[in-house]
Amino acid sequence: NWRKQVKHGDIILVVDVGGGTTDLSLIAVLEREGNLELQRIAVGEHILLGGDNMDLALAYGVARKLAAEGKPLDAWQTRALAQACRAAKEQLLSDGAPESLPVVVPSRGSKLIGGSIRTEITRAEVLQTLVEGFFPPCAVSDAPQTRARSALTQLGLPYAQDAAITRHLAAFLTRQAGALAQAEGASFARPTALLFNGGVLKAPLIEQRIVQVLNGWLAQEGVPPARLLEGAELDLAVARGAAYLGYVNTLGRGVRIRGGTAQSYYVGVESNLPAIPGMEPPLCALCLAPFGMEEGTEVALDSQEFGLVVGEPVRLRFFGSSV
């Protein structure tokens, strides 16, 4: 029933907060031959920030409370506590939730039962840690906070430095201000509708905070608030969408969100200039696949000629941009 919820000209902001990542995108509702179509017009970075961060934040908060009571936890118990906090979080953020829930941290060794540590986590603690810590009110001009990094770091995934998802949302909409045909001088992309996805957003309080922050930004611009679209089961929507996409691709019919490549992709081309001491030749970026390039299409670069370096080690440089 999605056609009953949207209209031609709508810009839908999709906020997807899952277990380990946050993804943001903008989808335009278009009309073609009398039928409504969906086209993805902007995609944000794949932010490594999600429900796992929230579970760890709760676990470390409870661990500090236990340490103050003379009950320090080891690394194994902290991981077990994070799993217990995940279950408690989902219950305490739901409608009609109790004021607190018990949390049991198992011990290791022969005293598995008798040595277990019992505590509780309150609804107020969850609200303070998650809603205020990960979804704080902010201005649309705020950018994710960064800090000076240590010169040496362990190799691993590029986790987000700022845990505030609302600031990542503000940065995404600000970057995409020029991607939409909206009023000239708009400081950020202004969606007309909002769609949630991901198990984290099943919590009504988190959902309400995002709606409140986004519509606060829109009110400052003097535009109507974004309306919340009704979705299905938020933790199963991606799996169902993937299955439906396979169905559409196999049978060649059905509703498909047009969008193509999520980024523009470039290859580096070294400039042909005279040698200058201490200066490397400038690198130009040649676009190989523009944003939105559909699967199976080709782009001919007939007007370009390049020299290929052979017989020696070389380095191919590739770049991507979501702006």
What do these predicted regions represent?
Residues 1-323:
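Oxyanion-binding/catalytic loops of NTP- or PPi-dependent enzymes
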